[in-house]
């Protein structure tokens, strides 16, 4: 059975291209690798929807960057995220997901992830905070987080934030056709360890695109 089908007649170059993909996928599968199903390969319309969702998601983080400050509560960050997301025709994905009560995760200092915004937690000078935003736009999911330094932070915290950003940038260089997720994970892990850090292995990522 062919992995790729089309109701439209393909050009010769398109046929050769798809045949090449089929052969590569079959070869990987024969070696025991997990390979993408046809469902995982997105259509042009789906990619457009995912990109729109991601654009809103990024705009939320930019908005937080413009407003976050010492004395702000994490509840105020949550309100900011919720209002902006709804105003742009989208939905905050975390809200009520498996009982999560808020629209965003706010993780401060030693909190690894999934911190819950509250009216009692006030940002203080020297804090570092990760704001993790997930957006649903017309059924398409996007997710990204960003670190923010509140005022002057210690050199220890500054270095952690900087190296983490470098890890992300290195990981992105591995996101290309026929690479493995493990290629991305490897360069991130290597750079973190070279700088005296380690990866949080107990917590993995989650889906974006058509699933959360």
What positions do the PLM features span?
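Active-site neighborhoods and metal-handling regions in enzymes and metal-associated proteins
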Residues: 1-212
């Amino acid at each position: 059975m062919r992995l790729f089908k089309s109701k439209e007649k393909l050009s010769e170059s398109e046929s050769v291209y798809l045949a090449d993909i089929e052969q590569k996928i079959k070869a990987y599968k024969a070696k025991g690798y997990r390979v993408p199903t046809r469902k995982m390969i997105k259509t042009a319309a789906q990619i457009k929807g995912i990109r729109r969702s991601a654009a809103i998601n990024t705009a939320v983080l930019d908005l937080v960057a413009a407003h976050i400050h010492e004395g702000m509560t994490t509840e105020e960050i949550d309100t900011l995220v919720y209002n902006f997301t709804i105003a742009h025709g989208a939905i905050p994905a975390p809200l009520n997901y498996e009982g999560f009560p808020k629209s965003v995760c706010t993780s401060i200092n030693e909190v690894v992830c999934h911190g819950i915004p509250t009216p009692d937690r006030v940002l203080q000078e020297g804090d570092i905070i990760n704001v993790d935003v997930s957006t649903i736009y017309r059924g398409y999911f996007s997710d990204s987080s960003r670190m923010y330094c509140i005022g002057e932070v210690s050199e220890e915290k500054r270095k952690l934030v900087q190296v983490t950003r470098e890890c992300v940038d290195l990981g992105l260089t591995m996101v290309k056709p026929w690479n493995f997720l493990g290629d991305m994970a490897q360069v991130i892990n290597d750079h973190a360890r070279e700088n005296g850090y380690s990866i949080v292995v107990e917590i993995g990522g989650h889906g974006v695109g058509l699933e959360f």
